[in-house]
Amino acid sequence: MKAFRYLLFLVTLLPWLAVHAQAVPYDQEPVRQVHWAMGAFFGTGWYQVDKNRSVFVFRMPPRQTVRRSGFDETGERKIGVEIRYPLTFGLHKLDDIPDFIEFDNYGTISFTPGVELEIPVNERWALRPYVNIGAGYEKESDEWAGIWYGGLKSRYLLGDDARLRWSLLNAIYYAGYKPEYKSRGRYGAAMAGLEFSQPLGHFELGGEPLRFNYYATYTYLFDKLNFHVDDQRTESIQDQWEIGLAFGHSSKKMKIWFISFEQIGLSYKTSSNGRYKAISLNLRSPFTY
């Protein structure tokens, strides 16, 4: 039981791990160099390591809800099932991007479909185990790689009244890749944080009451991530702090044209040593991301 509690104390990152490898010459492989295949874990946003060449990641996360979780009138538990189809592009020639993005600007592309369950432990506590398996392609090196990742996310409701709803977030995460003709790599991480949501009085959007959603999380990487930023220097990252702000509806998803979002906002990420920074779109809670 103690080990199980420790397991729940962790999980969700790697989403920022490796697209920075675009700036690394292929004949140089520093110890534990971040591989481009890890770009599949990024959310849509701008990423930078120590003012080195920036990378923009565009992640399309379509998903299909097969069944929603909850408890029926008899108290029987219903496990939610969600099928995910994330398609990720890594863009590395930012100065060359015109008004309309062309394929020549793409450094990487990956497709990693997966399944995610939502298990309601009780009325306050829910778990989300998930697994994704797919492949990616890097244009400059003409390299393919198998990609897989999975983990367990936890959300525990600490309080809910008319003024504020807040929850404890935890997660553990494990991911890996296998390039052609090269050895495989693996990464693990653990996350803990708090999530808040409060109504915005009489403010509405599209006839629906608005809520202000925000969270703060800390993610620890079990292994340092090394980024080769120039010929003489490698920067290492061991953790990530993240703050997210967003607006959402009280009872249903937000919608722009035909695309639905849980919420709309931004998140800011940085490492403790200040070498890594990122600004990402904040479209879902870390629990349902």
Task: Outline where the language-model segments fall.
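Short glycine/proline- and aromatic-enriched beta-strand/turn motifs that initiate or cap beta-hairpins
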Residues: 21-98, 289
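Transmembrane beta-strands of outer-membrane beta-barrel pores
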Residues: 44-46, 64, 87-95, 119, ...
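Short loop/turn motifs that connect adjacent beta-strands in outer-membrane beta-barrel proteins
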Residues: 65-82, 119-127, 159-167, 200-211, ...
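Outer membrane beta-barrel transmembrane domains
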Residues: 91-103, 204-289
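Residues that define the transmembrane beta-barrel architecture of outer-membrane proteins
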Residues: 52-62, 79, 105-111, 144-150, ...
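Transmembrane beta-strands of outer-membrane beta-barrel proteins
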Residues: 77-85, 127-131, 148-150, 164-172, ...
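Residues on the lipid-exposed face of transmembrane beta-strands in outer-membrane beta-barrel proteins
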Residues: 58-68, 111-119, 133, 152-158, ...
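Detector for outer-membrane/organellar transmembrane beta-barrel domains
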Residues: 143-226
